[in-house]
Amino acid sequence: MTYRCLLQMVLLLCFSTTALSRSYSLLRFQQRQSLKECQKLLGQLPSTSQHCLEARMDFQMPEEMKQEQQFQKEDAILVMYEVLQHIFGILTRDFSSTGWSETIIEDLLKELYWQMNRLQPIQKEIMQKQNSTTEDTIVPHLGKYYFNLMQYLESKEYDRCAWTVVQVQILTNVSFLMRLTGYVRD
């Protein structure tokens, strides 16, 4: 009897995860809620004075992030996943010079990780189909953009001003992700 219940629970979990990943409306809602939480957490991080923003540079943000563009649902998911991975990677660097709360950063990383976990099964399926155009266009541009952000942090030795500049970039990225969630529909 116990094994039958256990088997039913395992099957239910497997099918519910698959079913949930297919409900794009639910995914869109959950992503938006999580992104709002990310914005709130980023806003709680103290930023330094305005003079730090004078130290910013052109990180060569892809045009697709700067201006409104139409995305297919699949392309939006691939781009969202890529952006989330890069933001996660940046926030795992040495931010000790910033005075930022480790708790806030941990909560932010949890939100980002949760979002990536929700997108990953769909992202893998899309990648297997290989009919997406984003691999040839925006994804390499994203890689270069985030590489430039990382190089900037390293060249500034992760100082407080550099992190302020990157914080502004990440807030812009989260706004871009919010726009992208609009393309994730059933």
Curated annotation (Swiss-Prot):
SUPFAM superfamilies: 4-helical cytokines. One of its GO terms (cellular component) is extracellular space. Pfam families: Interferon. Residues 1-21 form the signal peptide. It comes from the Eukaryota. One of its GO terms (biological process) is natural killer cell activation involved in immune response. This is Interferon beta.
